[in-house]
Design a protein with these regions (language model features):
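A short small-residue
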Residues: 14-16, 117-124
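Hydrophobic-ligand binding "helix-grip"
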Residues: 52-53, 58, 63, 67-110, ...
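Residues at helix-coil transition
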Residues: 35-39, 82, 142, 146-149
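Conserved beta-strand segments that form the floor/walls of ligand-binding pockets within enzyme
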Residues: 16, 22, 87, 105, ...
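Hydrophobic pocket/interface hotspot
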Residues: 30-34, 62, 77, 88, ...
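A conserved amphipathic terminal alpha-helix motif
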Residues: 2, 121-154
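Hydrophobic ligand-binding cavity/cleft-lining segments
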Residues: 1-50
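Structured surface interface patches that mediate subunit assembly and partner/cofactor docking
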Residues: 13, 43-49, 53-54, 138-143, ...
Length: 154
């Protein structure tokens, strides 16, 4: 995984996180796992449930529903092309005015599926987020891989 942070101060930062994940499962199973793990099966890196709602369609919301019309909007589906592309745009988990773009590109490779992930962020990024973002994405991607590989037919 690579992480690049640039900008003279916290107000003008850009952050890019990239990761390639090889999954021993079909494109369809991997894409389905991605949607599920970003949605209702989402967890914190330490394994605590953090269920989200992901509406997998253009303009669909990705949010945390706290009940009673309360919650947190993390982003909107900018592009989706099943089973090879999911792109989300929004503030994600940062309430500082920063904006993010997440891109998942899936391709069929020998022995399964390759996921090319890229998180691009522009805006103020508090130090604790800089340190925890890459491990957070790695934890989600490990769950996507595990679930997709467990679901594949023998």
């Amino acid at each position: 995984m690579t992480t690049t942070l640039s900008g003279p101060d916290q107000q003008a930062q850009t952050l890019t996180i990239a990761e390639d994940i090889h999954v021993r499962a079909s494109l369809e199973a991997t894409f389905a796992s991605l949607i599920t793990q970003l949605g209702r099966q989402n967890e914190t890196p330490d394994g605590k449930p953090l269920p989200m709602i992901l509406e997998p369609r253009p303009g669909g919301r990705w949010y945390r529903d706290l009940g009673g019309d309360n919650g947190h909007l993390w982003g909107l589906v900018q592009s989706i092309k099943r089973p090879v592309l999911l792109e989300i745009w929004g503030p994600l988990f940062i309430s500082t005015g920063a904006i993010s773009n997440l891109m998942y590109r899936l391709s069929e490779v020998d022995g399964g599926t390759q996921i090319a992930f890229k998180h691009s962020l522009v805006g103020p990024v508090p130090d604790e987020f800089q340190q925890n973002m890459a491990p957070g994405w790695e934890a989600i991607h490990a769950r996507v891989k595990r679930a997709a590989e467990a679901a594949r037919p023998e």
